[in-house]
Amino acid sequence: LPIDGTRQQYDNMLEQFFTEHPNIHHCITLGSKAHVMGDFLLRTNRREVQIMGYDMVKKNAECLRQGSISFLIAQHAYQQGYCSVDALFKAVVLKKKIQPVNYMPIELLTPENVNFYRRTQL
């Protein structure tokens, strides 16, 4: 879906997609707009489609609670940004060798645990 599309454009594209591909039952969104598809599935009563999305934003959480999104991957953006700048500082300014890969935590949110999620700085 285009980033700057309207709800009507999204609805038309999704309706065409699901009409042409009726056997699709699992979807993933690779951005914070899983709610666009979640809202569409609720409005069109397509309960057989499961969505995995990214980012704990308000609209995604609402769709998760309503069941149109199966689960969300919550990332810790503050920690990711801090660790990136810290690694850059150590490499460029302090001339230290840094790890080429730095793993960051994620959390899987479901309708059952979303109300207990607390975004914290780890």
Q: For each predicted feature, which ranges?
A:
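Hinge/beta->alpha junction and helix N-cap segments in small-molecule ligand-binding domains
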Residues: 1-12, 29-33, 55-57, 76-80
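Short, well-structured alpha-helical segments in soluble
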Residues: 9-23
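Local beta-strand N-terminus motif with an aromatic residue
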Residues: 23-24, 69
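Venus flytrap/periplasmic-binding-protein-like
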Residues: 29-32, 42-70, 110
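Phosphate- and divalent-cation-binding pockets in alpha/beta enzyme and binding domains
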Residues: 36-37
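Hinge/cleft segment of the Venus flytrap/periplasmic-binding protein
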Residues: 76-122
